[in-house]
Structure formats: structure tokens, C-alpha cells
Amino acid sequence: MDYRSAGVDIELGRAFVKGIRERVEGSQAQSSGSSGTLGGIGGFAGLLELPAGYRAPVLVAGTDGVGTKLEIAQQWGQHRGVGIDLVAMCVNDVLTVGARPLFFLDYIATGKLEPEALWQVIDGILEGCQEAGCQLLGGETAEMPGFYPPGKYDLAGFCVGIVERADVLDSSRVQLGDRLWALPSSGLHSNGFSLVRRIVAERGWPWDHQPPGWDRPLAEVFLTPTRIYVQAVQRLQAAGIPLHGMAHITGGGIPENLPRCLAPEQAARLEPHSWPIPPEFLWLQEQGQVETLEMFNTFNLGVGYVLVIPPEAENRLRSLLPEAFPIGEVVPARPGESRVLGLEEWGSLVP
């Protein structure tokens, strides 16, 4: 008896890590500037030299996963997008305090190492890191036979960023009357998929079903990768736009995430129907007979990221990010009431 007969192929794992190292080195060669990495992939730990120019640097850490969106990717056989999702979920969180992503680590757990699928995941992770301007510094691939069924895997990601202490964004910067501007999502991103899967299953739709008016089947629309907002925010930072706060709209939707960048005595007042709801959300609401407030509490509904800025910065923000749109303002919180006001005035998602 040996380890391979127990379900763990050491040689295949070694070849997989070698391939990752080659891909990372190729990705670094294509990127501009110094990576700051010391050594390479495959050691016990990854090393990265802190960039110069910081007077009082603060390191910022975040971790996340992709959730049950992975189930659709594994059924549909498309895995690259969830690699991008993994990076996006972590770097977008780190970004909310004003940090620049520095490096990323991944964890892949699977019942049986299947390189064809996992290469797609790694390529997606590298693509996400390149877009976010950070390095893939290391990771872990765990082959766990008997724990995960064949063909199944789970992902976790870890990101560390850096920000000048004086530039850290927290709720103390947010003022009453500040305006809320949204950056559009690319779709469902990586949240709400347990409800998505239940709706699709109970309605009996196959993943290759293409609803009327759609240009792609359900699986491809729902697997659209999470948008990475690093470059958009860095454009604002470089232009000196006074960012008072930022919120990444993930699990729990706007009601759960927007208050996280506000002070306890503050609330967000949303203007009803201030943006069009993308069709995939309207389809899910109709197919699942989901109430409007439940939709807000589950999905991003087209708002992937929220910027809190003073009113005098609105015109400059609009010129720098034409895709951004205003959704409301910061108002006093009402004792015993929701920290996100105006949702009850929406009624239907369609005006």
C-alpha cells in the first residue's frame, strides 16, 4: 500500500506546483515594474519586500471565498472565472480602507487533483492578480480523497495590501450630506448563489437554458467574473478625489454592507429607482417569486461598489468614472430603524 493507492498523487502534485511556478514567473515577466518578490513559488513561505516611499505603512489583510458559485462552475466545466472571483472578493475588501493590494495567496482543496480544471482556476487567479496589481506569492493545493467527492474543489483566497497610516479610510471621515456613488457590478459577482441554484432547480431549467432576450445561457451569465475595482479607485486617488468611505457590496447586499463604512449615528438614504436593475436579477425575482426587500438583502442588484464623497467632488468623479452613478446620500440614523433608508419605497424593482 502507498500514498497513491490512498488517493494522493505526490508526483502529480509536484508537477502541478512546477506548472504554477512557471505560470507565475511568466506573469511577472509580462507585468511592468519590480514585483518586489524575493524567491519564488514553492518554498515554505513567500517573501515580498515592502515598496519604498511609505512614511508610516499599515498592512491590511482580507480573506474570502467564492461560495456555491463553484457548484455551477464545476457543473458547467468553466473554471477560469472563479479564479478571478477569488481575487476580486479579497482585493475589493482590502481596497475599502484605501489600501493598495500587494500580494495574494490561494488555497485549493479537492478530492482528486484534476489539473485540466485547476489550471483554469490558476490562470484566472493570475489574471485577477494582474488586474489588481498584486503578486501571487504562494498558496496551497490540498488533495483530500474521501473528504471531497471526485470533481469537486473549494477555494479560499488571502490578500495583503498597504496604505499610508494618514490615508486609512474609516467612518470618522464620513460627513452628513456626503453623496453616495455606485460603481456597477458585472453581474451577480459571488454572492446569493444558494438562492440562485434553488430557483433554477425548482423551476427545472438546465444551465444551458437561454431566457428570451438574453444573448447567453444561464450558466454563462451567472458565471460572469466579479469586477475588480482597484484601477477605478486608484484613478480617483491619483486625481486627488476626497474619498470619505467605500463599501464592497457582497453577501447581504446593500443593507448589510453599506453601513459598514458609516459611523453608528449615520445612515444611507437611497433614491428609489436611481439605477436600472440588470435583467438577470429581474429574471431571478420573477422565477423565484422573491420579494423586493429579500432581493436587496441577497444580491448586489447592479451595485458592486459604493463610494462616499463630498458633494463638491461629484462633477470630477463623474468625469473620471463615467460609468459611476449617484444613488443617495448620508443622513442621520433613526433610532430603531434600518441604517439603509428608502428601500421600502422601491416597491417593485421595475419602476
UniProtKB/Swiss-Prot annotation:
One of its GO terms (biological process) is adenine biosynthetic process. InterPro entries: PurM-like_C_dom (IPR010918), PurM-like_C_sf (IPR036676), PurM-like_N (IPR016188), PurM-like_N_sf (IPR036921), PurM_cligase (IPR004733). The keyword Ligase applies. Pfam families: AIRS, AIRS_C. It is an enzyme of class 6 (ligase). It comes from the Bacteria. GO terms for cellular component: cytosol. It is found in: Cytoplasm. One of its GO terms (molecular function) is phosphoribosylformylglycinamidine cyclo-ligase activity. Its EC number is 6.3.3.1. It catalyses: 2-formamido-N(1)-(5-O-phospho-beta-D-ribosyl)acetamidine + ATP = 5-amino-1-(5-phospho-beta-D-ribosyl)imidazole + ADP + phosphate + H(+). Keywords: ATP-binding, Cytoplasm, Ligase, Nucleotide-binding, Purine biosynthesis. Pathway: Purine metabolism; IMP biosynthesis via de novo pathway; 5-amino-1-(5-phospho-D-ribosyl)imidazole from N(2)-formyl-N(1)-(5-phospho-D-ribosyl)glycinamide: step 2/2. Belongs to the AIR synthase family. This is Phosphoribosylformylglycinamidine cyclo-ligase. It comes from Synechococcus sp. (strain JA-3-3Ab) (Cyanobacteria bacterium Yellowstone A-Prime).
